[in-house]
Structure formats: C-alpha cells, structure tokens
Amino acid sequence: MSDSEEDQTALVCDNGSGLVKSGFAGDDAPRAVFPSIVGRPRHQGVMVGMGQKDSYVGDEAQSKRGILTLKYPIEHGIITNWDDMEKIWHHTFYNELRVAPEEHPTLLTEAPLNPKANREKMTQIMFETFNVPAMYVAIQAVLSLYASGRTTGIVMDAGDGVSHNVPIYEGYALPHAIARLDLAGRDLTDYLMKILTERGYSFVTTAEREIVRDIKEKLCYVALDFEQEMATAASSTSLEKSYELPDGQVITIGNERFRCPETLFQPSFIGMESAGIHETTYNSIMKCDIDIRKDLYANNVLSGGTTMYPGIADRMQKEITALAPSTMKIKIIAPPERKYSVWIGGSILASLSTFQQMWITKQEYDEAGPSIVHRKCF
C-alpha cells in the first residue's frame, strides 16, 4: 500500500479483554496484536536517569512484568478503567500502527449486551480525545460470522473476558436469544493456577498468572469424554507433558491439561451456577423462531481465542447432537484463524462500499452527542 492510499484507510481495532487486535481495513490480518495490559512499577526507581515511565502498555508491560503490577482495563468485555483504556488506544494509534487517528475513520468492537454507557463513552473518547473523523461500534460475534463468509448462523464467541452465543439471521443479531456467559479465558487461567497449586506449584502474582496463561495455551485440550480421559490419566502417564518455567524449573502436568478447559462445559468446576457452552448454545437456538433453527444448527461458528483448544469442535458436535432433535444436521465450523476472526470481519465490513454510509461522522456527533451511537450502530 502506498502512503497516498493509506491516508484515508479505515482503522479496525478489536479491543478484547485479553488482547488488542488492530490494523487497517482491507488487510487480511491485524498488524498489531498486543496484550490489553497497563503496568505500573511496584517499587520506587533507584537508577537515576533511567528514564523510568510511570506506566507501560502491552508487550512492554509484559516483558517488564517482574517489576510491575499489571492491570487489565477491560473486564468481562466491559471497559472498567477509562484512563488506562485511553493509554491503550493511544499506544495502538501512535506506537503500534503509527497513524494519526484524526485522519482515519475507526471501527471499534464490543461485546453484545454491553451497558449503553460503555458504548457512549467509547464514542466520546474517540471523537473528543483522538479527534477521529468518523467511527462505528460493531458487535464482535457478528463480525466473526462475516469473516466465515456467512450471514446466518449462531456464533459461539469465547475470548478472555466474556463468552457469548449470538444467533444471527440474514445479518441481523437476534437480541432476545443472545446468551452471555461471564466465563472465559481469564477464568480458565485462574482455575489452572488453582489446580496447579493443589499439585504443589505456587503461582500467585500478576506476573506468574501470565506464565500459567502460557501453559494453558500450549498444553491444554478438551477431552471428548471427560470421565474416560480422567481414567486414562489416572492409570497411565501417557497424557503427561512437561513445561519449563522461566527460571529453568521443569513442571509436569497431567489431567490438569483437560480439567482446565472442561470448565467451559461444566462451569460448576469453578463454582458457577451456569450452563456449559454447549447448553447455552442449545438454549439460544431454542429461543429463536422454529423456522430458522435448522439453519442455526447447521452453522455453528466458533470464534475467539478460548475456542482454540484442540478437541473443542468435536466435543461441541457431540454435546449439541445429544441435545438436538435426532434428525437434525449439526455442523460446527471452527476456522483455523478464529483467534482473529472478529478483527477479520471488521476489516471486511469497514472496506465494503455499502458500509461507507454507516459511519458516525464527527459532524453527526457534534450535532447529536454520544447517544448517536445507539441510533447508528445496532
């Protein structure tokens, strides 16, 4: 892309609870992917002239985590700390993408069923702090469906902070049937910390949590039959894997590998009185009109980083088949790039010629204020 073309290109920023994915509309993958973390020093600086900053964002916070306290400004998909969120957006525009936000329309994403105030405040910061010429807020799961090349289906989107089932028919999300589950990657990381502690390995600090997250991403998988897998793990060492910690110590994990993500199907493991993701998917389909259920069963799209566990698609297929009518054709679609499918869908949407009239412009914002977002983005 030449500079002249990149002038007016829209920016797409998928602000996840765990990772920020950002880049230019029309690209096939995000340019910048970094943790949604703001870190502040735990101790007073002693080295004079080291130019210590009072806060670090993203990868830099991650690499200096040993001396920092790490905070995630987005919890369960909702922005809870606006000052830190502003730092993350600033870092995205100026350090990662190296663009002037006042020159680019910007597409942001949010979780379904988010509080209205959250969306208004996002709009306000974009126009007033970053002076963007235009912006739009899209629902994450809808973008994932676009990325899979469909306009009808039910998306099971599970990220780091929130999971949800969103049935979509001909491009419209059906709000009455959306199921939201505040159980996602971060809870699984916490649970893995807990069960590793039971094994005698201690992980406590915010920095150590990041190590456990890495163990989870590298070694965990979903069992097709949990009870049988537990029996196998108890009777042999075939399921054991070892992991080297940053200090060189090697730890071995066995049944924790599949006990951790099993929580998605049995939230009671972490004391939640909720249905598992297979049941929420089924319940969500059952809340839809009887005529469209067949299309939803045949188009179960998985998206988000927490659906990256090996074995999850087969397990979903098995569980939903058990719940659905016996003659129903059930298909689980798990695209290999599903970690980024929300961003990819945003990139597709923002580059459509038909979408260009959908942007909220600076002028519209100045006339109507932040509430314009509810009228133009649905």
From Swiss-Prot:
Alphabetically ordered keywords of this record: ATP-binding, Cytoplasm, Cytoskeleton, Hydrolase, Muscle protein, Nucleotide-binding
Compartments reported by the entry: Cytoplasm, Cytoskeleton
Transmembrane segment boundaries: none
Molecular functions (GO terms): ATP binding; hydrolase activity
Keyword Cytoplasm set for record: yes
Family as reported in the entry's similarity comment: Belongs to the actin family.
Protein name in the entry: Actin, muscle
Organism this protein belongs to: Ciona savignyi
